[in-house]
Amino acid sequence: MTAFHSSPRMLGQKQDKFWLTVGLCALTAALIFLPFYLLDGGFFHYAGDFNSQQISFYRYMNGFLKGAGYPAGYEGVKNTFSWATDLGSGTMNAYSFYLYGSPFFWFSLLFPQNWLPYLMVPLLVLKFAVAGGGAYLYLRRYVKDPNFAVLGAALYAFSGWGLYNIFFNHFLDVVALFPYMLAALDDAVIDDKKGVFPFW
């Protein structure tokens, strides 16, 4: 067969359902958040820290890292100190816990600052999709039927802990990325593929 045609599956070979799992988790998350997103006019207002911190932190740091908010003639090093945070604070100290370690935050920098309040739901959908995909990669090694890995991945992604802690948006980064670390550890220990795990 040519490179453009896949070879037929051998008897007993597992079918990879990674993208199915990612899509299923993204669709499920979209169905969960979409009614609230529409009722709130494109915003997702949840509770507590999500409204007062998470949305504003994403929006503020998006503009801050792009150079917004500096006084005219400012000669200092940009993007390191914020007078708008607390009584003035180094941004690495103030935002590393919430944002700087999050690949989802860095992805959000591709969009304009004013879009960030509207992007919170798409970012949440992405986090749940990534969590489901990672859980599938980890679980598929331990099941005979890949459908059980899909089911386990969906149960992991939409566990009570993950859904409850939506208002701590940065907690979901751990839910999304942890299964990839587990899968990489299994690859290193079981399959002796040591290339990926050191990066975790």
Language model features with spans:
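Membrane-embedded helix bundles of polyisoprenyl
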Residues: 25, 129-141, 147-200
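Coil-to-alpha-helix initiation sites in intrinsically disordered, low-complexity, charged segments
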Residues: 9, 17, 75, 82, ...
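Membrane-interface coil-to-helix junctions
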Residues: 29-132, 154-176
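Intrinsic-disorder/low-complexity, polar/charged segments
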Residues: 13, 48-49, 102, 145, ...
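Membrane-interface helix-boundary signature
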Residues: 17, 113-120, 181, 197
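Start-transfer (signal-anchor) and selected internal transmembrane alpha helices
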Residues: 1-37
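A broad structural signal for alpha-helix termini and local helix breaks/kinks
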Residues: 111, 142-143
